Amino acid sequence: MKILLTNDDGVHSPGLAALIKKVSEVAEVVVVAPDREQSAVSHALTLHHPLRAARIRANVFSVEGTPTDCVNLGIHSLLSYRPDLVISGVNRGANIADDVTYSGTVAAALEATLMGIPAIAVSLVTRSAGEHFEAAAACAAKLAVTVHQKGLPRDTYLNVNVPDLPAESLLPPLITCQGKRSYEGTIVDKVDPRGRNYYWIGTTDLSFEDIPGTDYHAVSRGHVSISPLHIDLTNHASIETLKSWELP
């Protein structure tokens, strides 16, 4: 099995180091990851300047670009073969509920899925530096073997969130659906020494609806959450209702 690894925390992040260590035990690994942190860039592509890549050691490439750039460049240029699987992570911080739409980690898995390659995004549920990246990476390695053996449904990729706990304390994985975040929309408005306004977003504490069966419900109780995500964003249940509208 040959696996391409990437992330959005950067090529030197502890989560990626843990993933390299654990996944290398079950597969041949090549890393193509951003040269710096690219958190919350979602599915962005670099289109207005050239990408640059550097081999920093054997089978590890650093790219001046986004996670989606890394998947594209890895599969279409840097690798001499088509990987069996792409794993993105281990992200420092949860990627659950509506936050998956912002995530560069999840978007890298989406990009691989668009190319027809099975993919897994894996994140460590922590609001600090994170301690148990290796436990999360071990979960990803085990799941990689299962996915390689069984395959994934068409246009589907897996979003895995692992509580920041020692491996022996983790509860069994649960298959979950995407949860719902409660948004407060607080903006921090400041004035710099030259009298100009500047702003910080994303500074409030995160809160989520505690709904059984969701990713948040699982990880908040110590379970590993595995959510199958789909490329098709259509709300199929609403189509017939919208067809009944008198459209202009």
Curated annotation (Swiss-Prot):
It comes from the Bacteria. It is found in: Cytoplasm. Binds 1 divalent metal cation per subunit. GO terms for molecular function: 3'-nucleotidase activity; 5'-nucleotidase activity; exopolyphosphatase activity; metal ion binding; nucleotide binding. One of its GO terms (cellular component) is cytoplasm. It catalyses: a ribonucleoside 5'-phosphate + H2O = a ribonucleoside + phosphate. SUPFAM superfamilies: SurE-like (SSF64167). HAMAP family: SurE. NCBIfam families: PRK00346.1-3 (NF001489), PRK00346.1-4 (NF001490), surE (TIGR00087). This is 5'-nucleotidase SurE. The gene is surE.
